[in-house]
C-alpha cells in the first residue's frame, strides 16, 4: 500500500482549504486559522500553530506541507528595485521584482516559466515556454517577498495585515506582469489572486491587484465574471498589421475583438478605465501618426496609456525610442485628453526592468549548473 502524496497548502485558496479540512474531519474555522498562519504569520511548519488542536497538527504533519520554491538569487538595484530568481524545478527559473515608491510598494509576479506569446520586444518570450506555475508557486512569490522585505526592515514579527507597527504590510500593490501570460494559466492564477484579496491572507483590494494580458479575449470575459481585478492590456501597436508582427496573439484576437472585450470588462471592473501598455520602439510604432491612430482604435474604451521605453536585448533587433520622440508621442495623446504616463525605467542594472525578466536566455537553461539546486545566494547591492 502506497501513502498518498502530501498536499502543499500553498496551492489552496480559502475554498480549497475548507474542503481539505473537511476531508480531515475538521470544521471550516480551522481553514481560516491555517490560512492566517501560512499567509500572515509566515509559518513554515505546523508545530508553531498553537491555536490548532494537537491532534490536527499531527494529522497535518503526515499529510500536508508548506513548500516554497527555493530562492536562487536576490539582487538589489541602485534605485532600490529588488529582484529574486526563484527555482521552479527542471532547470527553470522565474523572476519576481519589487519596486519601491514613496507611497506604495509594487510586486511584479510571474505566472509561467517562459511564455508562449513570444512578443517581439520581450526577452522572456525568447526563452520559449516551459510550463505553467502552480498556485503555490504564484502566491509563494508574494509570501516570499513580503516577509523578506519585512525582515530586511527589521519588522519580521507579527501579522502582515497592513496595520501599524510590526504588522505593517510592505507590498501594497501586485501586478501580474512578470514572466508569462497570466490568462493562459487561468486555473492557477485566479486562486492565487483570491488569496491576494482575502482578508485572512494578504487583504489587498481589487484596485491594487492588476492583471496584464496580451489580449486572450475569451479569458478576459471569464475573468470579468469570476474575479474582476484591475486590467492592463499590452497593446503596443495601433493597427492589426503592426500588432500581428509585434504581438503574434493578435492574429487570433485582432484589435476589434480586443477593444470589444475591454468594453465588456469595464462593466464589472473595479476601475473605470483600462490601462493600455505601449512599448516605445524606435522607428517601429512611435510616430505621431501612430499616436493618432492609437487614439482612433481605442476611442470607445475609457483608458489611460502607459508608455514603456523599450529595454534593448541582443535578440530583438529593436531600439528604444528617443526621449524627445516619446514626449512628442505622449503629447498627441494628452492633447486629446487621455491620461498618459511614461514608465520610469527601474532595475535595468539588474535586468529587472520591463521586458527583461528572462535575463540572459542561455542562463535559464543551466540553472542547476550555475547555482547548485536550491542554493540561496546572498543579497548584494548593485
From Swiss-Prot:
GO terms for biological process: rRNA base methylation; tRNA methylation. [4Fe-4S] cluster binds at residues 115, 119, 122. S-adenosyl-L-methionine binds at residues 180-181, 212, 234-236, 311. Binds 1 [4Fe-4S] cluster. The cluster is coordinated with 3 cysteines and an exchangeable S-adenosyl-L-methionine. It holds the Pfam family RlmN_N. InterPro entries: Aldolase_TIM (IPR013785), Methyltransferase_A (IPR040072), RlmN_N (IPR048641), RNA_MTrfase_RlmN (IPR027492), rRNA_lsu_MTrfase_RlmN/Cfr (IPR004383), rSAM (IPR007197). One of its GO terms (cellular component) is cytoplasm. Its cofactor is [4Fe-4S] cluster. Keywords: 4Fe-4S, Cytoplasm, Disulfide bond, Iron, Iron-sulfur, Metal-binding, Methyltransferase, rRNA processing, S-adenosyl-L-methionine, Transferase, tRNA processing. Its EC number is 2.1.1.192. The active site is at 95 (proton acceptor), 354 (s-methylcysteine intermediate). It catalyses: adenosine(2503) in 23S rRNA + 2 reduced [2Fe-2S]-[ferredoxin] + 2 S-adenosyl-L-methionine = 2-methyladenosine(2503) in 23S rRNA + 5'-deoxyadenosine + L-methionine + 2 oxidized [2Fe-2S]-[ferredoxin] + S-adenosyl-L-homocysteine; adenosine(37) in tRNA + 2 reduced [2Fe-2S]-[ferredoxin] + 2 S-adenosyl-L-methionine = 2-methyladenosine(37) in tRNA + 5'-deoxyadenosine + L-methionine + 2 oxidized [2Fe-2S]-[ferredoxin] + S-adenosyl-L-homocysteine. Its main location: cytoplasm. CDD domains: Radical_SAM (cd01335). Residues 101-349 form the Radical SAM core domain. One of its GO terms (molecular function) is tRNA binding. It comes from the Bacteria. Disulfide bonds join 108-354. It is found in: Cytoplasm. Belongs to the radical SAM superfamily. RlmN family. Reaction proceeds by a ping-pong mechanism involving intermediate methylation of a conserved cysteine residue. Specifically methylates position 2 of adenine 2503 in 23S rRNA and position 2 of adenine 37 in tRNAs. m2A2503 modification seems to play a crucial role in the proofreading step occurring at the peptidyl transferase center and thus would serve to optimize ribosomal fidelity. This is Dual-specificity RNA methyltransferase RlmN. It comes from Paraburkholderia phymatum (strain DSM 17167 / CIP 108236 / LMG 21445 / STM815) (Burkholderia phymatum). The gene is rlmN.
Amino acid at each position: 500500500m502506497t501513502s498518498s502524496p502530501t498536499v502543499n497548502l500553498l496551492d489552496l485558496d480559502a475554498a480549497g482549504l475548507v474542503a481539505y479540512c473537511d476531508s480531515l474531519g475538521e470544521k471550516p474555522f480551522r481553514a481560516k486559522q491555517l490560512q492566517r498562519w501560512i499567509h500572515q504569520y509566515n509559518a513554515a511548519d505546523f508545530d508553531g500553530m498553537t491555536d490548532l488542536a494537537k491532534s490536527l497538527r499531527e494529522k497535518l504533519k503526515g499529510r500536508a506541507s508548506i513548500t516554497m520554491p527555493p530562492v536562487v538569487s536576490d539582487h538589489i538595484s541602485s534605485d532600490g528595485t529588488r529582484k529574486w530568481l526563484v527555482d521552479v524545478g527542471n532547470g527553470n527559473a522565474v523572476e519576481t521584482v519589487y519596486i519601491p515608491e514613496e507611497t506604495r510598494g509594487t510586486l511584479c509576479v510571474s505566472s509561467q516559466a517562459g511564455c508562449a506569446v513570444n512578443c517581439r520586444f520581450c526577452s522572456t518570450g525568447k526563452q520559449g515556454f516551459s510550463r505553467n506555475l502552480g498556485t503555490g508557486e504564484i502566491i509563494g512569490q508574494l509570501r516570499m517577498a513580503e516577509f523578506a522585505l519585512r525582515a530586511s526592515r527589521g519588522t519580521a514579527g507579527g501579522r502582515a495585515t497592513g496595520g501599524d507597527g510590526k504588522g505593517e504590510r510592505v507590498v501594497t500593490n501586485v501586478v501580474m506582469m512578470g514572466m508569462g501570460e497570466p490568462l493562459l494559466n487561468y486555473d492557477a492564477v485566479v486562486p492565487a489572486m483570491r488569496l491576494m484579496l482575502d482578508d485572512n491572507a494578504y487583504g489587498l483590494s481589487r484596485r491594487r491587484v492588476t492583471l496584464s494580458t496580451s489580449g486572450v479575449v475569451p479569458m478576459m470575459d471569464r475573468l470579468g465574471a469570476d474575479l474582476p481585478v484591475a486590467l492592463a492590456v499590452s497593446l503596443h501597436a495601433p493597427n492589426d498589421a503592426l500588432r500581428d508582427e509585434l504581438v503574434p496573439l493578435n492574429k487570433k484576437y485582432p484589435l476589434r475583438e480586443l477593444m470589444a472585450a475591454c468594453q465588456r470588462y469595464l462593466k464589472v471592473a473595479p476601475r473605470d478605465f483600462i490601462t493600455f501598455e505601449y512599448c516605445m520602439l524606435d522607428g517601429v510604432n512611435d510616430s505621431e501618426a501612430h499616436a493618432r491612430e492609437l487614439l482612433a482604435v481605442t476611442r470607445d474604451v475609457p483608458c489611460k496609456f502607459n508608455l514603456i521605453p523599450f529595454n534593448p536585448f541582443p535578440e530583438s533587433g529593436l531600439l528604444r525610442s528617443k526621449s524627445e520622440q516619446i514626449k512628442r508621442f505622449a503629447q498627441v495623446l494628452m492633447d486629446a485628453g487621455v491620461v498618459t504616463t511614461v514608465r520610469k525605467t527601474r532595475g535595468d542594472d539588474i535586468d529587472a526592468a520591463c521586458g527583461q525578466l528572462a535575463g540572459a536566455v542561455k542562463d535559464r537553461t543551466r540553472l542547476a549548473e550555475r547555482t547548485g539546486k536550491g542554493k540561496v545566494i546572498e543579497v548584494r547591492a548593485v
